[in-house]
Amino acid sequence: MTLVSALNYIHRTGLFGNHENKNEENLLKVSEVKNLLIVQIVQYKNSTIQFENIDIDDLNLKNEPLSVVSNSDTRILWNGPKNWLLVSTKKDLLKNISEAFRETDFAVTDLSHSRAIIELEGQNVKEVLKKGCPFNFNILEKNNSVNSTY
């Protein structure tokens, strides 16, 4: 399967904005992380299956706000009650996910072609995120996940 980025015809490389005569270390770098599997997993309200024991790439789902579980290839982010977003470099993991989560208990949706992972680098990344999201980034810790429309 060939993955095509949601930003395939939009993302351009180069220097944009007020960058002239600026120290390169002070510039914000924006890039897309490509070739990822992005899957939403939602447990139906009437499901009684215990999801904590379901193993995906040696990771288990956690139903705790802001939680993230990860290894070197896969990251599972809590997206809401019984709702997770899985991001992985293992594109063939979708078959395992579909087998692990029965259709009668879970909705599994491949979002790889409609979502993009954007990476921000630079000294003022937190300030940029604060402008577009109401979350208090001062309390954000490692392995926390935040939903935003930004």
Q: Where are the regions a protein language model picked out?
A:
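Basic, glycine/lysine-rich polyanion-binding surfaces/domains
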Residues: 1-150
